[in-house]
Amino acid sequence: MLYLIGLGLSYKSDITVRGLEAIKKCSRVYLEHYTSILMAASQEELESYYGKEIILADRELVETGSKQILNNADKEDVAFLVVGDPFGATTHTDLVLRAKREAIPVEIIHNASVMNAVGACGLQLYNFGQTVSMVFFTDNWRPDSWYDKIWENRKIGLHTLVLLDIKVKEQSIENMARGRLIYEPPRYMSIAQCCEQLLEIEEKRGTKAYTPDTPAVAISRLGSSSQSFKSGTISELANYDSGEPLHSLVILGRQCHELELEYLLEFADDKEKFGKDVANDQEYFKPAAWVPPTEDDSDE
């Protein structure tokens, strides 16, 4: 049996009872170690808590070495641990499909992730649209496909959750080209860098999917004892020191409910200004009034 087990957001004890029971009966335990990190628990602490040795699974192992993970999983129990929820990344879906192709039984044990815990900032989950990811820009790679999804969300009034990039055990392009197994130090994108990249692409595109004055909320260390939120415009948050990782950002949609706004105001430095920014943004993205068709517009 292959168990995909969600660990939750922060602490070793965030795992469910069912998940812990599954780990204890597994002969091998892998911890996915590149899409996110457990903020308040080290590998050693997890091993002590589970009573099991943990094998760190980097991107290379999961995406190209899945045979190692699935080896003998049809005869013994293997656990694949994921920070958050098991289906928080497409890579994990691919692992399940590979297991099923090899007739290996799979059991999923869910847990909290940023996708549902984001409601802690006060925004209602059913007012969210498509989630996007913001990667670190390089000198010659500045992808902006996420821009269109933000634009689509904003047009229909929905909030956009922006997941910020992390780099764990990644190689530079030069080292990859030379075949050198030298890895870069871990990096975690800050709120300020995310907002700077948002503004750069808006200036490049010029469609005004958002502006420097668009309201947003910064989310830091969600699910930990030091979690924090900061409401402000994108330009204001581009100068915000968000502290230790991990971070996410929500760009507000046009349909910001009054209860959502009341909650967000608690995280704003200037409550009056933020309230005006939200009102101005709602007016800016206000849809045109519906005009009934005239007889000339009909097909008759």
Swiss-Prot record:
2-[3-carboxy-3-(methylammonio)propyl]-L-histidine and the corresponding dimethyl compound can also act as acceptors. S-adenosyl-L-methionine binds at residues 9, 85, 88, 113-114, 164, 222, 247. InterPro entries: 4pyrrol_Mease (IPR000878), 4pyrrol_Methylase_sf (IPR035996), 4pyrrole_Mease_sub1 (IPR014777), 4pyrrole_Mease_sub2 (IPR014776), Dphthn_synthase (IPR004551). It is found in: Cytoplasm. The modification Phosphoserine is found at residues 172, 298. The lineage of its organism: Eukaryota, Fungi, Dikarya, Ascomycota, Saccharomycotina. CDD domains: DHP5_DphB (cd11647). It catalyses: 2-[(3S)-amino-3-carboxypropyl]-L-histidyl-[translation elongation factor 2] + 4 S-adenosyl-L-methionine = diphthine methyl ester-[translation elongation factor 2] + 4 S-adenosyl-L-homocysteine + 3 H(+). It comes from Saccharomyces cerevisiae (strain ATCC 204508 / S288c). Pfam families: TP_methylase. Disruption phenotype: Resistance to sordarin. Its EC number is 2.1.1.314. Pathway: Protein modification; peptidyl-diphthamide biosynthesis. PANTHER family: DIPHTHINE METHYL ESTER SYNTHASE (PTHR10882:SF0), DIPHTHINE SYNTHASE (PTHR10882). Keywords: Cytoplasm, Methyltransferase, Phosphoprotein, S-adenosyl-L-methionine, Transferase. S-adenosyl-L-methionine-dependent methyltransferase that catalyzes four methylations of the modified target histidine residue in translation elongation factor 2 (EF-2), to form an intermediate called diphthine methyl ester. The four successive methylation reactions represent the second step of diphthamide biosynthesis. One of its GO terms (biological process) is methylation. GO terms for molecular function: diphthine methyl ester synthase activity. The keyword S-adenosyl-L-methionine applies. This is Diphthine methyl ester synthase. It comes from the Eukaryota.
